[in-house]
């Protein structure tokens, strides 16, 4: 992770991962096994927060851009669990790859010192399928999905093609800064 990290930033990450030992034979490289480590994700999200806060060409709500303390949740779950969340909260049937549930949405948060961003849920099974489909590693796919969910927590949306292209470009930028 080559970005210089702003030392004042504090991140409280709540990380949970189901037991996916049945997939261990599909995770042959050392880098892919990092996706099950809390400390790995903490470094990733800290790096991304620093990048976003330092780059002035990304519009952030004031209640994010002026803060130094954040928390978020990341859960790696099964297709069954994400399908249930997808049905309950998005009114869509079946599993999806990533769901984000932002907590921040109100300017009244300006007075808070610590900002709870929300929660990201990633289906490992969908990520594995997509990594095969797109011919890249599960590590790459999980980072891609996490970056997508993270940007949603910060308020990015993709309601049209231009917004989607901008969001995907920012995801790629964030990911390339990790290597």
Curated annotation (Swiss-Prot):
The intrachain disulfides are none
What GO molecular function terms would the record report? Answer: metalloendopeptidase activity; RNA endonuclease activity; zinc ion binding
Record-listed E.C. numbers: 3.1.-.-
Task: Give the record's keywords alphabetically.
Answer: Cytoplasm, Endonuclease, Hydrolase, Metal-binding, Nuclease, Ribosome biogenesis, rRNA processing, Zinc
Q: Which residues bind Zn(2+)?
A: 148, 152, 158
Q: How is the cofactor bound?
A: Binds 1 zinc ion.
Q: Which InterPro entries match?
A: MetalPrtase_cat_dom_sf_prd (IPR023091), YbeY (IPR002036), YbeY_CS (IPR020549)
Pfam families registered for this protein in UniProt: YbeY (PF02130)
* Organism domain of life: Bacteria
Q: Which cofactors, by name? A: Zn(2+)
> Where is it located?
Cytoplasm
> Where is this protein primarily located?
cytoplasm
- Gene Ontology biological-process entries: rRNA processing
Tell me the function of this protein: Single strand-specific metallo-endoribonuclease involved in late-stage 70S ribosome quality control and in maturation of the 3' terminus of the 16S rRNA.
Family listed? Belongs to the endoribonuclease YbeY family.
Q: What HAMAP family does the record point to?
A: Endoribonucl_YbeY
Q: Which PANTHER family match?
A: ENDORIBONUCLEASE YBEY, CHLOROPLASTIC (PTHR46986:SF1)
**Name the UniProt record assigns to this protein:** Endoribonuclease YbeY
Tell me the organism. Answer: Prochlorococcus marinus (strain MIT 9215)
Q: Which gene does this sequence derive from?
A: ybeY
